[in-house]
């Protein structure tokens, strides 16, 4: 079947492209026995934009359960947050570790 190039609608397939949402990743802080609780709260407030109350709740969850989710993001944002938190922890001589895992 020959296309009629004078009529663009004859060569353009009608329909919508279906885009899947990007995969999401959980950014998780891992508890350790050396990082002060107030430093964890500072990290949560600075990098995850939590208010004092929410940061304290998440910090206690991390302390009690051994780990806690700080946020859920697309891959590139999650990678950036993990790197920023781990770099900040090292700069402040704390072993606090941040990781990400697929949701």
Swiss-Prot record:
Pfam families: ClpS (PF02617)
Sequence similarity: Belongs to the ClpS family.
Domain of life: Bacteria
Purpose of the protein: Involved in the modulation of the specificity of the ClpAP-mediated ATP-dependent protein degradation.
Transmembrane regions listed in the UniProt entry: none
Subunit relationships: Binds to the N-terminal domain of the chaperone ClpA.
SUPFAM superfamilies linked to this entry: ClpS-like
Protein name, per record: ATP-dependent Clp protease adapter protein ClpS
Coiled coil stretches, renumbered: none
GO-annotated biological processes: protein catabolic process; proteolysis
Signal peptide: none
Protein species of origin: Nitrosomonas europaea (strain ATCC 19718 / CIP 103999 / KCTC 2705 / NBRC 14298)
């Amino acid at each position: 079947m020959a296309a009629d190039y004078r009529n663009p609608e004859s060569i353009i397939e009608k329909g919508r492209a279906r885009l899947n949402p990007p995969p999401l990743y959980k950014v998780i802080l891992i508890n350790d026995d050396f990082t002060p609780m107030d430093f964890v709260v500072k990290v949560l407030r600075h990098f995850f934009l939590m208010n004092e109350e929410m940061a304290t709740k998440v910090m206690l969850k991390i302390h009690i359960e051994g780990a806690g989710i700080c946020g859920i993001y697309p891959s590139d944002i999650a990678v950036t947050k993990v790197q920023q938190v781990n770099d900040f922890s090292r700069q402040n001589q704390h072993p606090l570790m941040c990781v990400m895992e697929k949701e």
